[in-house]
């Protein structure tokens, strides 16, 4: 199995989701099938949901959310893609970290694409319990040669 921190710099299609809260709709699994990687940003809640996601095929990286009881899942995962330092965590930090170019998080159930200082904050929204009028959503992150492309996908 390849070390996720040392994958080639070719374009990678990463399927990003968060806050599934014990539910993984079939549509989400269908969308995820074409991914090179899957990143779940926490609040999976049930191991069976992670098992379903892993059965889709691509490598799955997960971080623990505030509703997750599995202490084997890390709170933070730092990765490098396309020459950029990416931090995956569930709850967004209060301040922009100095050691990351991009922070991907869940928790708020609201999509986010915001630059704070030199750090880009991205949130795919929530699969099952959308907030503040946002529709349920997931996202695609394409990474290559120091560039990112973020595309939100509504599940409505």
Regions found by a protein language model. Give the residues of each.
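Active-site glycine-centered loops adjacent to acidic/histidine catalytic or metal-binding residues
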Residues: 19, 43, 65, 106-107, ...
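Conserved beta-sheet core of the metallophosphoesterase superfamily
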Residues: 61, 82-151
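Metallo-beta-lactamase
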Residues: 54, 72-90
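N-terminal active-site segment of His-dependent metallophosphoesterases
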Residues: 1-60, 68-75, 134-137, 145
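Residue "hotspots" at secondary-structure boundaries inside conserved domains
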Residues: 30, 77-79, 95
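Well-ordered alpha/beta subsegment
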Residues: 152-156
């Amino acid at each position: 199995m390849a070390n996720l921190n040392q994958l080639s710099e070719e374009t990678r299609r990463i399927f990003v989701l968060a806050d599934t809260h014990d539910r993984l709709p079939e549509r989400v699994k269908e969308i995820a099938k074409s991914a090179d990687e899957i990143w779940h940003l926490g609040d999976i809640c049930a191991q069976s949901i992670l098992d379903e996601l892993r059965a889709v095929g691509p490598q799955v990286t997960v971080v623990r959310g505030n509703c997750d009881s599995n202490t084997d899942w890390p709170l933070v995962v730092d990765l490098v893609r396309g020459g950029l330092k990416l931090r995956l965590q569930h709850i967004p930090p209060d301040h922009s970290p100095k050691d990351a170019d991009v922070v991907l998080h869940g928790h708020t159930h609201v999509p986010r694409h915001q630059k704070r200082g030199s750090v880009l904050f991205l949130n795919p929204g929530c699969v099952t319990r959308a907030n503040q009028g946002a529709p349920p959503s997931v996202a695609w992150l394409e990474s290559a040669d120091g560039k990112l492309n973020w595309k939100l996908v509504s599940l409505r």
